[in-house]
Amino acid sequence: MIPPKPRESQWTDEQWQAIYATGQHTLVAAAAGSGKTAVLVERIIQKILHKERPIDVDRLLVVTFTNAAAAEMRQRIGEALERALEKEPHSLHLRRQLSLLQKASISTIHSFCLDVIRKYYYVIGIDPVFRIADEGEMALLKEEVLETLFEQYYAENDEPFLTVVDRYTSDRTDADLQTLILRLYEFSRSHPNPSGWLQQIVHMYDVEEGARIDDLPYAHYLFQAVDLALEAAEYRLAQALQKTKEPGGPDYLYDTLASDEQVIAKLKEARHESWQQLHEAMKNVSFATAKRKPKDGAYDEQLVEDVKKLRDQVKKEISSITEELFSFQPVTYVRHLHEMKPIVTTIVQMVQRFAHLLQAKKDEKGIVDFSDLEHYCLRILRAPSLEHELKPSEAALYYRAQFAEVLVDEYQDTNMVQESILRLVSNDDEATGNMFMVGDVKQSIYGFRLAEPSLFLQKYNRFTKDGDGGLRIDLAKNFRSRKEILDGTNFIFRQLMTETVGDMRYDDDAALRFGAQDYPDKQIPVECVWINEAKEESDEEEQEDVTAVQLEARWIAKKIKQLLAEPFFVYDRRLKGERRLMYRDIVILCRSMSSASAMLEEFRKQNVPVYAELSSGYFSATEVSIMLSLLKVIDNPYQDIPLAAVLRSPIVGLDEEALARIRLAKKDGAFYEALCAFVQEPHDDELHEKMKRWLASLSEWRTAARQKPLADLIWQLYRETNFYDYVGGMPGGKQRQANLRALYDRAKQYEQTSFRGIFRFLRFIERLKEREDDFGAARSLTEQEDVVRMMTIHKSKGLEFPVVFLAGAAKSFNMQDLRSDYVLDKDFGLGMRFVHPTWRASYPTVAQLAIKKKMKWQLLAEEMRILYVALTRAKEKLYIVCTAKDMEAKKKKWQEVAYTSTWELPAYVIEKAKSYADWIGYALARHQQGICSSATVLHDPSLWDIHIVPAHELEQEDAQANEHRDIVEAIQQLQPVAIKSEYEEEVNRRLFWTYTHAPATVLRAKQSVSELKRQRDIYGGHAEQPFRKELVERPRFLQAKMMTPAERGTMMHLVMQHVDVTKEVTVDAVREQIARMVNGEWLTEEQATVIDVESIVAFFNTPIGKRMQRATRLEREVPFYLAHEMEGETVVVQGVIDCVFEDEHGLVLIDYKTDRVSWMNDPKQQLKRRYKGQLALYREAIEAIWKREVTETYVYAFDGALLVPMEVD
């Protein structure tokens, strides 16, 4: 029963329903910015706080898409419980929920699977001691197993295998067939029953020779392709006929066009009969010869040309679909399928054998991947011997009893295996079930991860708003964006997103509704710019060769500068008002980062700070390339190119002349041999000595490579060559050092896998390069820096920005998968080309043709969803940036469909689009503010600012950017620059300006607690000045090699932070913990020796220490910032509280000290005097954060194991 919504509630009616609805499976279709996470958290909280039937938080299974989302969810729930506890401070139920929260099942699906496996591993007979392998390790392992697989087949001289190799590999390599095996294996793992799915592939080719194409399971997609072609032909003929009736139109062609319409009508009739009849009709199509233009007629030449062009397009459309789908008789297509069955059977057997070998290898190494986690979990939860049925096992029944509700975030991104797992742990009856699913199928953009949006769509279409057989709730109100952005997005997607191409219809339920009422009332249109690359003939030779990427970057840079100069104001909800736009408010979204480097270079020239996490460029970075070359030489010095690269690099620093001298020592053979011969010659010049020293170092490094971990070797190289410090002094040194640290970290991760050694690491790097799987430049920027962000649309999902630029909208869709010789589909399996056994000619099979058609529509649907994600990231201002080679030709093409009577654009138009710009152009051509002068769909409420920028304007701006180069060069050379007199007054005003609050400048805006302690004279009145570090320190080589008291205190605090209070704290237990911290590199062995273990154990033997171990809540090393009044100014106090715990007596605050109290006369009183003020600040901070009073405060001195209670004022 849904409770009535209070009048003052901030929730919408739909959100309120989503929070309280129960009794059946519920699907919440949450549009972008609709507050779905807030709704999900509130639903969980209300279930926990229910007055009559409260549920413990650990009886809820909450599945999120990422670990970050799970952590945020847990944090939000914790904060909500804290707020509830403030209102009911004595509630044992709430305290219990806070204690249960940390072990509650709020995680990704993989984390939940891991928990299930850890608990029930014995059910499926696997070793519980395993680790999760990373992608790099698995790639190497799969490559190794593939090689083993092919070696075995070749050794067996297997005839069916050799037939497959003969027909489907090149003369030089088996790489194509190996890739197919690997892709089939990976694809099968997204199915709940991989082996069954592979067998289904074979069944798809189990076709009798007399079968009809109409009866094949994928025939629908073939017919649909024909339908779209005929629809396009009909539409164009209708346009052509209309033009013949216009004044000056070629009416003499009317009868010819009417005849063409009859041809199309006959094709449509045949299409509804059978594929055989359609085949015959398509092959026998004959268009009438067009009548000649009468000599005495006065005709508009443009209309004549338009009609002829439209008719040519019709003929080309019919010819193209005929050539694509009707090249062979239907009986031939069927025969090809029949003859392909032995081939497909062999390939499937190879995949199954590969899976078996790979599993054995993983078992041997004790590793699993994320796919294994899902399948192991499914095997545990599914009842045995029911491979094709989804019946719960005893383990699944346990979880069904355990979880009162299963809540799934981002449900549109689940796959079929994950869906099966969720069904098994929930009540699977949709009418009375307990699964709550939240998502937005319009944002399902992870097809490359084999996500299955159809699972969401099926439920969306099956569930009803009244809950009959499952409840559907639409959250359409968007609380993120301005109304203009939502109206613009709706205008585009009402026309684009159809069931034929977009998988769903963008109707009123799917449309975005404005909900962010706090925005100031002003109109900010969506801006769409087309940069026209068409060159004027007179200027063509003078224009520079600028790419589309550079042009877009220049326009964006110009606009960003303009926005900051105007200035443009954005609404800040934290300030509850407007503020000036900052760089960090702006994001540039790209479909991919392939052109990011070129854009970044252009922004650098325009002095616009832009940061992007590049997915490529890491291996080509100079510093990384040099270090990899050095590793190659250490592995094998008989490699000329890496050796020459190292010798020419700053590590050695030879020039061409030196290299030539070395080569003359031995003109033949490897360069390393020449180098060895060179140093043995009787010379004593500087080059000989230098190379002798370097060869000695190389020998030491080669020995070290055999004796120590790879990561340690790399750090040794950084240290001994000084290369790390050297690149730090180069331009972009911070980024270069980050790249070198990334190489060290990657080597460290590699050593933790089942592979070892420098040779295999280098081979692993080479494989990454071959697959174009770059690491991307290492991150050297924090999120808080004031720069423009550039990222992919995928990376932006879930984020929001005040100003969004969608760049590269005219870039063509990636249809590379459709050009492959084989295609895969979850329903229809494998589509391959038929290779004639004698002629070796290859032809597409009907299965391949159908699957390719389906794939294309799926790819377009996903591209449509990606565009939707991009447009809905913007909060206040959206720019769509496109380029066009010939804008007039584009406008003419878009205008052809502007007269469509329905909101939805014709499906063939959407299908034939090559880019986002095409889709947007077709849509905007029909808007009253659109590019084309006349349209059918008019007076839409969306506001657009659409303009065309000639490319030459941006090319001229590049020259203008360089006009002050002489001034810049003068400044760089420290030469005086004459300044115009009109600026003198302003310059002088700025130079001689004085700050009215100068006294406040000597008081730091942010103070540490220790600094405040000294300033307050807490030590007893003798410290007149705050402690300041000596400006000149003694050199390190003159300092004593011993640990300072401050360092010792840090080590003691670190150990106290990690003491396991859930177990008895003994001397042995603490020593074991210190040993683990040394192994984990938390402590060095030297630092471990100064830890006073006995004083740590002594603390836990005190009454307070024992109470800490029993506490209901324990927080250690709690950082805080506190606004504090000081000398009439507000400063921010920063500190870290050692320990706070809560038990039945209230909040207890403890601070650890390493002071030498044994030297004090009255240690308790001295500690109280010394730290009274500091502990008062700590108490003030905790009470402000936790909203509760601190009842007890203590100082514990390790020296003497002295526990001192502090007075609480």
From Swiss-Prot:
One of its GO terms (molecular function) is double-stranded DNA binding. It catalyses: Couples ATP hydrolysis with the unwinding of duplex DNA by translocating in the 3'-5' direction; ATP + H2O = ADP + phosphate + H(+). Residues 510-798 form the UvrD-like helicase C-terminal domain. ATP binds at residues 30-37. Belongs to the helicase family. AddA subfamily. SUPFAM superfamilies: P-loop containing nucleoside triphosphate hydrolases (SSF52540), Restriction endonuclease-like (SSF52980). The heterodimer acts as both an ATP-dependent DNA helicase and an ATP-dependent, dual-direction single-stranded exonuclease. Recognizes the chi site generating a DNA molecule suitable for the initiation of homologous recombination. The AddA nuclease domain is required for chi fragment generation; this subunit has the helicase and 3' -> 5' nuclease activities. Residues 9-482 form the UvrD-like helicase ATP-binding domain. This is ATP-dependent helicase/nuclease subunit A. It comes from Anoxybacillus flavithermus (strain DSM 21510 / WK1).
